[in-house]
């Protein structure tokens, strides 16, 4: 499995670990007290929690910035900066980061700054950050790489042998390894990654177009829509627009909760990337560990609903979401 994922991402080595959060934890052990890391203000809530509530206690500092603005990223660099953490598209608002521009900024600022990309939302089928100069790519293999919602796992892919050796040493020292059976299941899932991703994004595009035209929807976050501010970047940087989307319901929390409870094909669950469609509420689920102030600064509101589009018939998904919005 490790060889397979390393080849898919174009890295020299992959290290499989027990969970996606274990992959992030493993990467974070490359740093020491006093180091500074730049990350997006709209990243996954679990990542934000680990950074803000755990690693800050170790003396590592973080700047959470608008990663879509490369000048903002550049201005956040300090003499202590050792890494730039990229999550693109971001979770849950599907904001994109210009990977090539950020890696260029990092290289210009000094050889000590490494770039790290969480590629879970796209999978290597749609995006390969190492091609744009990223040093480390990580995944929650629980999601698209496995694709069947029956595994918990993660992995770290390194661009250089030097980084690969450090990652492997830390993984062994920390005891973060993935079980052989889970690795076998992920490898099974990877065999259908291509057809699954094509089905995911067909359904996501159909759903996004319906939501974009629905009177009860205020805004749709999906890079496949031409109205998305990063649509052109997505066309350049990705090989497709993916199966994740979010939208804001006009009438606020009560209406958003009603949509989630009234949908019949979308299971209420926080995970993503499986063959079944899921719906969740970032305000109290995936991003509940962020402070309200941090959520609002990132653009996450009580109106926001996140959807992981499965591989079901797009017409069925559209019809079900429409009846949930209309009810």
PLM features per residue range, with description:
Residues 1-2, 99, 164, 183, ...:
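A general structural signal for well-ordered alpha-helical segments in protein cores
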Residues 1-15:
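Active-site-flanking structural segment that lines cofactor/substrate pockets
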């Amino acid at each position: 499995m490790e060889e397979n994922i390393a080849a898919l991402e174009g890295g020299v080595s992959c290290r499989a670990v027990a969970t996606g959060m274990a992959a992030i934890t493993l990467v974070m052990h490359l740093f020491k007290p006093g180091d500074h890391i730049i990350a997006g203000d709209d990243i996954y809530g679990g990542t934000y929690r680990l950074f803000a509530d755990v690693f800050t206690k170790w003396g590592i500092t973080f700047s959470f910035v608008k990663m879509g603005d490369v000048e903002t990223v550049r201005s956040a660099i300090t003499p202590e900066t050792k890494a730039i953490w990229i999550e693109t598209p971001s979770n849950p608002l599907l904001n994109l980061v210009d990977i090539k521009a950020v890696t260029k900024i990092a290289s210009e600022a000094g050889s000590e700054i490494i770039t790290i990309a969480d590629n879970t939302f796209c999978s290597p089928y749609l995006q390969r950050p190492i091609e744009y100069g990223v040093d480390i790519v990580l995944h929650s293999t629980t999601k698209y790489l496995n694709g069947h919602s029956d595994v918990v796992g993660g992995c770290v892919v390194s661009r250089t042998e030097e980084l690969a050796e450090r990652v492997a040493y830390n993984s062994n020292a920390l005891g973060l390894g993935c079980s052989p059976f889970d690795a076998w299941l992920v490898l099974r899932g990877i065999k259908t990654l291509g057809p699954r991703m094509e089905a995911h994004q067909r359904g996501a595009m159909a759903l996004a177009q319906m939501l974009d035209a629905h009177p009860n929807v205020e805004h749709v976050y999906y890079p496949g829509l031409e109205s998305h501010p990063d649509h052109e970047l997505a066309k350049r940087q990705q090989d497709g627009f993916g199966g994740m989307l979010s939208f804001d319901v006009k009438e606020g929390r009560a209406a958003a909760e009603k949509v989630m409870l009234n949908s019949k094909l979308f299971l209420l669950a926080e995970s993503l990337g499986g063959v079944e469609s899921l719906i969740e509420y970032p305000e109290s689920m995936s991003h509940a560990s962020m402070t309200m102030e941090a959520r609002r600064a990132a653009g996450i509101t009580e109106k926001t609903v996140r959807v992981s589009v499965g591989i079901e018939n797009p017409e069925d998904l559209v019809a079900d979401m429409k009846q949930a919005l209309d009810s």
